[in-house]
């Protein structure tokens, strides 16, 4: 479907910052137009005009995230944890947002407390608000909390909401 809608490549890789600040390559299905960032890195937005028609569907049902299970298998991510950030944004966030690096005390996740409670952060101010949810998760992480997050994520996916 991706190839019919917007051509190849089908997969998208991007550097992210993981556990203890280590970089790794994140895998996703491509949902944006090719060369969407030819002008440089941009924050993703809820209504992002760089997203293809097919990409809107894939994102709505979170199908674009499925390749990240490879990152989980490789030990770079867990199912639940703070979402990983891009190094391009990471440097600024470390300077602007107190305690930002605390997010790296756990592996990044496919879903997290911030994703079910806050959604998108498209600037440093929103990222600071979202950090409070990540820190709450880190402080209260447990099998029960992980299960609650997973069930909330599955409910959100079933409803087709982000």
Feature annotation, model-predicted:
Residues 1-36, 71, 143-162:
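A hydrophobic, helix-centered structural microdomain
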Residues 34-37, 56-59, 78, 132, ...:
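A broad detector of the eukaryotic-type serine/threonine protein kinase catalytic domain
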Residues 1-4, 19, 90-93, 102-103, ...:
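Intrinsically disordered, low-complexity segments enriched in polar/charged residues with Gly/Pro
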Residues 9-50, 111-132:
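Short, glycine-rich, amphipathic interfacial segments at transmembrane boundaries or analogous
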Residues 44-107, 149-157:
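A short, structured surface patch at a secondary-structure boundary
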Residues 7, 18-21, 40, 55, ...:
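Glycine-centered flexibility sites
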Residues 97-162:
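C-terminal terminal-structure detector
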């Amino acid at each position: 479907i991706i190839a019919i809608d917007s051509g190849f490549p089908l997969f998208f890789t991007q550097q992210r910052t993981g556990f203890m600040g280590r970089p790794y390559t994140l895998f996703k299905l491509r949902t944006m137009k090719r060369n969407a960032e030819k002008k440089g890195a941009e924050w993703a937005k809820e209504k992002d005009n760089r997203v293809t028609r097919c990409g809107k569907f894939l994102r709505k049902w979170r199908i674009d995230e499925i390749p990240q299970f490879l990152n989980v298998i490789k030990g770079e991510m867990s199912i639940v944890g703070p979402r990983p950030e891009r190094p391009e944004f990471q440097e600024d966030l470390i300077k602007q947002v107190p305690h930002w690096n605390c997010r790296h005390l756990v592996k990044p996740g496919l879903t997290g407390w911030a994703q079910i409670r806050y959604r998108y952060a498209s600037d440093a101010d929103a990222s600071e608000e979202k950090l409070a949810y990540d820190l709450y998760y880190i402080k209260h992480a447990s099998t029960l909390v992980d299960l609650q997050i997973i069930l909330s994520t599955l409910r959100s996916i079933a409803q087709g909401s982000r």
